[in-house]
């Protein structure tokens, strides 16, 4: 048996964060238990969990402090309320049948305990660590979370230390606002007027990038933290190098021209996968986007069917969307050029996942209102808007 459990309960500074292992005495957890008890580390000395002095918890439990213990006051917290909480939680887990009583002598538990250096309230320390330990044991014994739960939650969750959700493109459709203006002050003004939305992407257009360089991404992040930022480089050569520049600048996605040599496109897509950002192939002026995609050994994350600003009176190429999606994978299709509020639904019905809008928003007299009009056409609620969260 090798089981892993984790739980966080309470508020700072007494907050409890428990990581634990449960396993057989004769298995890897048992070996780690023996090593931990005999190989001591200054400030992180492990101790056996006891109900009271001379009364070990069963299964035998080793407590390991996560935070360096620097003085006797901090040591007293570990040896007092934290140790008592862990021991009681283990004993109660056995009594309640969470840990089978008949296996209490066969198993060992290693519990890693976090105690904030500013924690003072013994009662809160005890209650938080008791609850967190008991919950972590239950989760370990039940195999929580399973893989399906992790996959469901991974894009919905916000880590409290991080403070915001890092967007991924898992819940289309999205509105992508493209900035083809070059005045950085004007860009920041428009950004400040755009409403918050889980379905909104920010694109730094090619003219803006040429004027200010790839570091314009960081300017956007300072003005609008947590944004999904697309860097439109329209890469035609040195695909891997330009994608790496975009990734190093903290872009979430980079645009490669579909007119580039096949090798350049493939190198760019592979570099994007390597660095963890999205690859977008822009089919601006490409006669047969499907043919280009079929010639590639690796597909991009997004294909953009792009009608140029200078060609906005010509016909859209949305009819190729189903064929593009049939090529496999989770490929998304973005449409750009001549998108207005009154034709967004047409694009979505054609299969578009991302609606790219530029001047209709960025040069609007009322940026917020115009953005909200486009967002309303997506008919998507905010992620977990109606879920009341504790932990799950």
Curated annotation (Swiss-Prot):
Residues 1-161 are annotated as: Formaldehyde-activating enzyme. Pfam families: Fae, OMPdecase. It catalyses: 5,6,7,8-tetrahydromethanopterin + formaldehyde = 5,10-methylenetetrahydromethanopterin + H2O; D-ribulose 5-phosphate + formaldehyde = D-arabino-hex-3-ulose 6-phosphate. Residues 162-392 are annotated as: 3-hexulose-6-phosphate synthase. This is Bifunctional enzyme Fae/Hps. Substrate binds at residues 19, 48, 66, 68, 83. One of its GO terms (biological process) is carbohydrate biosynthetic process. InterPro entries: Aldolase_TIM, Fae/Hps, HCHO-activating_enzyme, HCHO-activating_enzyme_sf, HPS/KGPDC, OMPdeCOase_dom, Ribosomal_Su5_D2-typ_SF, RibuloseP-bd_barrel. It is an enzyme of class 4 (lyase). Keywords: Carbohydrate metabolism, Lyase, Multifunctional enzyme. It comes from Methanothrix thermoacetophila (strain DSM 6194 / JCM 14653 / NBRC 101360 / PT). One of its GO terms (molecular function) is hydro-lyase activity. The active site is at 17 (proton donor). Pathway: Carbohydrate biosynthesis; D-ribose 5-phosphate biosynthesis.
């Amino acid at each position: 048996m090798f089981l892993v459990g984790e739980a966080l309960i309470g508020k700072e500074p007494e907050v409890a964060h428990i990581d634990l292992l449960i396993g057989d005495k004769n298995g890897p957890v048992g070996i780690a238990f023996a090593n931990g008890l005999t190989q001591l580390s200054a400030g992180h000395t492990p101790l056996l969990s006891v109900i009271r002095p001379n009364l070990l918890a069963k299964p035998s439990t080793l407590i390991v402090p996560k935070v360096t213990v620097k003085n006797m006051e901090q040591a007293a917290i570990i040896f007092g309320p934290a140790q008592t909480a862990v021991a009681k939680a283990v004993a109660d887990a056995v009594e309640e049948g969470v840990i089978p009583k008949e296996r209490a002598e066969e198993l060992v538990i290693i519990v890693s305990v976090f105690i904030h250096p500013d924690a003072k309230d013994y009662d809160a320390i005890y209650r938080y660590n008791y609850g967190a330990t008991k919950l972590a044991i239950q989760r370990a014994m039940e195999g929580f979370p399973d893989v399906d739960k992790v996959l469901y939650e991974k894009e919905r969750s916000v880590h409290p230390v991080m403070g915001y959700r890092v967007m991924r493109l898992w819940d289309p459709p999205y509105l992508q606002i493209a900035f083809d203006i070059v005045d950085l002050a004007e860009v920041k003004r428009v950004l400040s007027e755009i409403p918050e939305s889980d379905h909104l992407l920010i694109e730094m257009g090619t003219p803006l990038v040429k004027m200010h360089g790839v570091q314009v991404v960081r300017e956007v992040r300072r003005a609008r933290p947590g944004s999904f930022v697309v860097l439109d480089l329209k890469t035609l050569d040195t695909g891997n190098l330009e994608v790496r520049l975009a990734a190093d600048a903290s872009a979430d996605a980079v645009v490669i021209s579909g007119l580039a040599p096949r090798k350049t496109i493939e190198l760019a897509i592979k570099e994007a996968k390597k660095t963890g950002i999205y690859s977008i192939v822009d089919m601006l002026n490409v006669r047969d986007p499907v043919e280009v995609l079929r010639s590639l050994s690796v597909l991009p994350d997004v294909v953009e069917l792009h009608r140029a600003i200078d060609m906005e009176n010509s016909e859209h190429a949305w009819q190729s969307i189903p064929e593009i999606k049939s090529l496999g994978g989770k490929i998304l299709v973005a449409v750009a050029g001549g998108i207005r509020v009154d034709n967004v639904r047409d694009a979505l019905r054609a299969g578009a996942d991302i609606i790219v809008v530029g001047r209709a928003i960025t040069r609007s007299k009322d940026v917020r209102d115009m953005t909200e009009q486009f967002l309303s056409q997506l008919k998507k609620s905010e992620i977990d808007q109606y879920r009341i969260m504790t932990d799950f």
